[in-house]
């Protein structure tokens, strides 16, 4: 029996609970709380007309609702407030509620506090989803019963009654989720850190500090996996509470997971173990070699080396990450809608040997685009731009040319809709070309999320004649 869970159920039954947001991730949470008699009020800034699907999902359940633009003004009297990950914990209304005695928490915070199984968790600016998926697949292949959650999979608190002590839980955690987390995973992985989400975080330092919460309260028996090649994550070893392990594609470090002579190798004090040759990894790109190295460092104490190699040679990749959509008349279309930052787009473009037709742009989240000038010059033959960041991406490219006294030799096309951008990209393509959607920007100007953006792109591509 999970005594912590039973005590939580007993305690929360006597509380008034507010759940902020009636989105896909919170519906299972609301259903779960109601299932053992919790008094739940669901809050959302949208109106009932815009929440038809959610209301249908919750139909017949004893849930109260507080809706509309002023929904945050009605938090008085609640004992516990579940914030949605994208909601800053220092909003004045939340601060006031806490001052009045409310406990501010989240689905993930409660899950980590109550989970009986060992938890592996991954964060970072790039590579989170692929690395998390690799850890999940590797541990599953070894025979462990595994649960996948956080930013991917399904909300896990609603399934916690079924999680056993012998299971493994693998989580992808964003900086938003980590801002208020106190309970750390026993194996924490930070893939890399670069400026990101500065439209939500007040500064780069706040973003870094949020990422550090994944390990800052670990104990001496826990493990922290760090990227030696990233200056920010490399320095976190000084704050590690338990064991720390580096992975490095670029440096020959004495211990950790390294990439030497085209092979992923695990170096320990008295042993060297070869995992796999880089060219046998099925998904392309040096960034995916790094993702495998991070996953190897996280799992090597729990699985056989050949298990890692078997996954590496067979795993096709994650949807919306350099995903081949179709080939039409010799032109390949790739969907990499997950690429919401310049660093992700740079990594994606580096996987292609020849110059590509790039579709980029989206919502501006306040990060610099200077780094894109060089990669556009080297890897792009035609640039199609859309959204608020279109002019910033073009400016980064042209500034790069000007600083080096180079001439512009690529065609730049600005578009207003995704239908237009797909049609014009197709019109510019010749046999043998690759067209890739890699926005280097978030999706929220036109879409619900990056998955929605990627699915719209795929539908438009598949409708081309």
From Swiss-Prot:
Instruction: Report any one BP term from Gene Ontology.
Output: regulation of cell shape
Record family assignment: Belongs to the MurCDEF family.
State the Gene3D superfamilies in the record.
Mur ligase, C-terminal domain, Mur-like, catalytic domain, NAD(P)-binding Rossmann-like Domain
Q: What is this protein called?
A: UDP-N-acetylmuramoylalanine--D-glutamate ligase
- Organism of origin: Ruminiclostridium cellulolyticum (strain ATCC 35319 / DSM 5812 / JCM 6584 / H10)
One GO cellular-component annotation of the UniProt record comes to: cytoplasm
* Location of this chain's protein in the cell: Cytoplasm
Which keywords accompany this UniProt record? ATP-binding, Cell cycle, Cell division, Cell shape, Cell wall biogenesis/degradation, Cytoplasm, Ligase, Nucleotide-binding, Peptidoglycan synthesis
Q: Which leading EC class covers this enzyme?
A: ligase
Q: Where is this protein primarily located?
A: cytoplasm
């Amino acid at each position: 029996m999970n005594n912590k869970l039973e005590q939580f159920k007993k305690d929360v039954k006597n509380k008034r609970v507010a759940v902020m947001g009636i989105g896909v991730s919170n519906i299972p949470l609301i259903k779960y709380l109601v299932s053992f008699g919790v008094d739940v009020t669901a809050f959302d800034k949208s109106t009932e007309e815009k929440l038809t699907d959610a209301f249908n999902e919750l139909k017949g359940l004893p849930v109260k609702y507080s809706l509309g633009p002023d929904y945050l003004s009605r938090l008085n009297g609640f004992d516990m407030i579940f914030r949605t990950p994208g909601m800053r914990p220092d909003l004045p209304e939340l601060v006031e509620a806490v001052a009045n005695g409310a406990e501010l928490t989240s689905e993930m915070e409660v899950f980590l506090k109550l989970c009986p199984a060992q938890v592996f968790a991954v964060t970072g600016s790039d590579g989170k989803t692929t690395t998390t998926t690799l850890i999940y697949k590797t541990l599953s292949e070894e025979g462990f019963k595994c649960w996948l959650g956080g930013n991917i999979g399904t909300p896990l608190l609603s399934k916690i009654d079924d999680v056993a002590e012998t299971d493994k839980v693998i989580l992808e955690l964003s900086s938003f989720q980590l801002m208020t987390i106190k309970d750390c995973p026993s194996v924490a992985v930070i893939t890399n850190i670069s400026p990101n989400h500065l439209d939500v975080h007040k500064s780069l330092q706040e973003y870094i500090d949020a990422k550090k919460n994944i390990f800052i309260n670990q104990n001496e028996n826990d493990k922290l996996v760090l990227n030696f090649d990233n200056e920010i994550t490399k320095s976190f070893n000084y704050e590690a509470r338990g064991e720390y392990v580096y992975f490095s594609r670029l440096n020959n470090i004495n211990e950790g997971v390294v990439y030497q002579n085209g092979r992923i190798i695990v170096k320990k004090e008295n042993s060297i173990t070869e995992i796999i040759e880089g060219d046998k990894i099925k998904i392309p790109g040096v960034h995916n070699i790094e993702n495998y190295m991070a996953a190897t460092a996280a799992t090597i104490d729990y699985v056989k080396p050949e298990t890692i190699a078997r996954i590496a040679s067979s795993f096709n990749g994650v949807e919306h990450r350099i995903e081949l959509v179709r080939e039409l008349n010799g032109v390949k279309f790739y969907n990499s809608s997950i690429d919401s930052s310049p660093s992700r787009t740079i990594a994606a473009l580096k996987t292609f040997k020849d110059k590509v037709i790039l579709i980029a742009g989206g919502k501006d989240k306040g990060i610099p685009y200077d780094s894109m000038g060089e990669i556009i010059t080297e890897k792009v033959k035609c640039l199609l731009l859309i959204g608020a960041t279109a002019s910033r991406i073009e400016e980064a490219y042209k500034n790069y040319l000007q600083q080096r006294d180079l001439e512009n030799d690529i065609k730049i096309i600005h578009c207003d809709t995704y239908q237009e951008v797909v049609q014009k990209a197709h019109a510019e393509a010749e046999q043998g070309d690759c067209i890739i959607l890699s926005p280097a920007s978030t999706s929220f100007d036109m879409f619900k999320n990056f998955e929605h953006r990627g699915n719209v792109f795929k539908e438009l591509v598949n409708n081309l004649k």
